[in-house]
Amino acid sequence: MRIDQRALDQLREVKITRNYTRYAEGSVLVEFGHTKVLCTASIDNSVPRFLKGQGQGWVTAEYGMLPRSTHSRCDREAARGKQTGRTQEIQRLIGRSLRAMVDLKKLGENTITIDCDVIQADGGTRTASITGAAVALVDAMNVLLAQKKIKQDPLKGLVAAISVGMYQDEVLLDLCYEEDSNCQTDLNVVMTQAGEFIEIQGTAEDKPFTRAQSNAMLEMAEKGIAELIKKQQEALGW
């Protein structure tokens, strides 16, 4: 039995609340158990310099944690004057994942910036960020369509992400902080609605994992992501 009494293959309670803030073209509060992330999508009717004149758009992401989103207060990165390597890695992951769901040619010369701000962290902040941000991105693209700034829907399909891990040689789905801190291996998996992989990040913390264990973790991740895609579709009213 797990720390929070879940089954090995059970997600934490997942909530996706759209239109959470007033001004952003897309805004979502996503909750994976006690992990809560505010994801906003903002439209800029221009593109970075390296894309000017190419007739395509761009999707990028930023990620941050509120100072008291964790058990003890962490300094704001702005106060330190630079982002940590972890922050840079996570926001690049979010950006890569979200670009996989968009036909950038159909987006026109528009940029959508995703901001993922962790309000409360209990493991899986990057996977929750991707899952919530995907919904916010859909809403932002629908704004562009409604305003007739683009002619075709750029959406190729939803994406979602989940963590899995090995703990005492058993595969666990959707790790909370305590599980993540004590597991032998943890994997972060990002997949498309079509069941294709975008990213697999895996690290053996305690002891190496076998090919069979890797396959078992990926199968568990596929199951969890399929459930998350359904949650996204429900939130979008599809």
UniProtKB/Swiss-Prot annotation:
Catalyzed reactions per annotation: tRNA(n+1) + phosphate = tRNA(n) + a ribonucleoside 5'-diphosphate
Enzyme class (EC, first level): transferase
GO molecular function per UniProt: 3'-5'-RNA exonuclease activity; tRNA binding; tRNA nucleotidyltransferase activity
Residue sites binding phosphate per the record: R86, G124, T125, R126
Alphabetical keyword list: Nucleotidyltransferase, RNA-binding, rRNA processing, Transferase, tRNA processing, tRNA-binding
Keyword tRNA processing: yes
Bilayer-crossing regions: none
EC numbers, comma separated: 2.7.7.56
Matching Gene3D superfamilies: GHMP Kinase, N-terminal domain
GO biological process, one term: rRNA catabolic process
Domain of life assignment: Bacteria
Family matches, as NCBIfam families: RNasePH (TIGR01966)
Subunit structure: Homohexameric ring arranged as a trimer of dimers.
Family: Belongs to the RNase PH family.
HAMAP family: RNase_PH
Entry function: Phosphorolytic 3'-5' exoribonuclease that plays an important role in tRNA 3'-end maturation. Removes nucleotide residues following the 3'-CCA terminus of tRNAs; can also add nucleotides to the ends of RNA molecules by using nucleoside diphosphates as substrates, but this may not be physiologically important. Probably plays a role in initiation of 16S rRNA degradation (leading to ribosome degradation) during starvation.
Name listed for the protein in its UniProt record: Ribonuclease PH
GN (gene name): rph
